[in-house]
UniProtKB/Swiss-Prot annotation:
Top-tier EC class: lyase
GO BP of this protein: isoleucine biosynthetic process; L-valine biosynthetic process
MF terms (GO), sorted A to Z: 2 iron, 2 sulfur cluster binding; dihydroxy-acid dehydratase activity; magnesium ion binding
KW RNA-binding (keyword) present: no
Protein name from the UniProt record: Dihydroxy-acid dehydratase
Annotated organism of origin: Rhizobium leguminosarum bv. trifolii (strain WSM2304)
Pathway(s) it belongs to: Amino-acid biosynthesis; L-isoleucine biosynthesis; L-isoleucine from 2-oxobutanoate: step 3/4; Amino-acid biosynthesis; L-valine biosynthesis; L-valine from pyruvate: step 3/4
Catalytic activity: (2R)-2,3-dihydroxy-3-methylbutanoate = 3-methyl-2-oxobutanoate + H2O; (2R,3R)-2,3-dihydroxy-3-methylpentanoate = (S)-3-methyl-2-oxopentanoate + H2O
Family from the record: Belongs to the IlvD/Edd family.
Keywords of this entry: 2Fe-2S, Amino-acid biosynthesis, Branched-chain amino acid biosynthesis, Iron, Iron-sulfur, Lyase, Magnesium, Metal-binding
Disulfide pattern: none
Amino acid sequence: MPAYRSRTTTHGRNMAGARGLWRATGMKDSDFGKPIIAVVNSFTQFVPGHVHLKDLGQLVAREIEAAGGVAKEFNTIAVDDGIAMGHDGMLYSLPSRELIADSVEYMVNAHCADAMVCISNCDKITPGMLMASLRLNIPTVFVSGGPMEAGKVVLHGKTHALDLVDAMVAAADEKISDEDVQTIERSACPTCGSCSGMFTANSMNCLTEALGLSLPGNGSTLATHADRKRLFVEAGHLIVDLARRYYEQDDIKALPRTIASKQAFENAMALDIAMGGSTNTVLHILAAAHEGEIDFTMADIDALSRRVPCLSKVAPAKSDVHMEDVHRAGGIMSILGELDKGGLLNRNCPTVHAETLGDAIDRWDITRTTSETVRNFYRAAPGGIPTQVAFSQEARWDELDTDRQNGVIRSVEHPFSRDGGLAVLKGNLAVDGCIVKTAGVDESILKFSGPARVFESQDASVKAILANEVKAGDVVVIRYEGPKGGPGMQEMLYPTSYLKSKGLGKACALITDGRFSGGTSGLSIGHASPEAANGGTIGLVREGDMIDIDIPNRTISLRVDEAELAARRADQDAKGWHPAEVRKRNVTTALKAYAAFATSADRGAVRDLNAR
């Protein structure tokens, strides 16, 4: 039977000093011997997805103590990618994932916590905590802050559903008046919560359901809705039960590495492909698998992308559909239910809340459940009142969306497309692969060829796009923006948004060794591996080179013969693999430390001590 980790600091005469310190935090004699549960919060006033989390850690803590555990809360950092976007702040976003994982490890191991509840929400916080949970392999439950309500605005007599990306696109569109831009800006983000579309934050919170590490509804229940409180209350009780199962009954099914097995990662990736999740999820899933020593690679993602159809399209792929609409259609359990009906899911994976994922789907899929409680849960609707307060409204939809032929969630027989929402492309331009969110690509440009417009930075590309120097038919290439070359692998949301604002969203392609925001749509191909700084072919592209993209056949090619490429490579080796133009970029010691050990995106941009 495994011993409680916390007894290292709470038992024995030689731990008198440690017990004295524990007592100073409020512990009593009766607490020594109870499981010590770390409540890993990520409250910050910088991020709308986290601004409402301040009191929720203590809500969970009270439930832990009511269930017989001892709760100890600490905080991690949290970067808002939207606020950090478009300037040097974005260099810090992806590296913050590693810092979050490390900080959780440091706190939990330094104080010998037995288990943890991870209160996450936005882009790098859920992945960082997920990496930590698999690294530590102690009982863990995830409960996120929940998605924001979609914005609503009336412009020129028409009602529009809005999100953050709409504000960015409008601001760059010279045809839209200052007054309308301001109206859109003020309406785009009306409440607390993670941005309202199927962007990175919501994608990752949905994937925790498929991995079996969070409760049903974690990915789709609105931050403002009273129903979300139940997830936090249940998480507090559940984690104590999981801790006791592992430490007192030697039940390894309470551990993250048993729950989030390779089969569970396949489920999560199948969900990601079916719902057209953010391309960033590929990075984070690969990184989490690495931490859990799970053999899950780009090859597995490629194989899944060839057989899993696209069953849901949410903003940015479908601008009038947001997470509140996904929830009304049954949320993640109903998407998993459709995959299950199509034989595309591993039903026997354990979860933190049910014996198997299959059992959970049978109870929580609104098309098969007999529970009115479950059906009422998925009727939770937006309140339509701007607020930063969690659980502040109780609105309900009159009816659920159970239309699997034309609704927000489709059946395998009636998909949005037979090909899934994400695809891995390979070719001489990306030998180790690159990623495209096919759910956001117009069918007319699934095959695309054009001349390269080469930029050594995101900033240079933005300047050219806004100056109308990029034309229809061009392939914009942005390089030296990978994990090492950036450093930090910036998101390219501004270039893609500005292409859209110029009417080029369906007329151009963009290829980068950087990455994209979950808010990106269009023919946007990221994570080109190896990255330019690691000698990738993207570093050899020259202005005007023809590039061929074939999504149906999963290829991406630079139309340059091998002899010419070899000559260019020899020339670049002599010069060194760095941008041809000097970039005004403040690369601090912290960023240099990340760059020194960062791998390319095909490995999840994780650190490798042998990378140097």
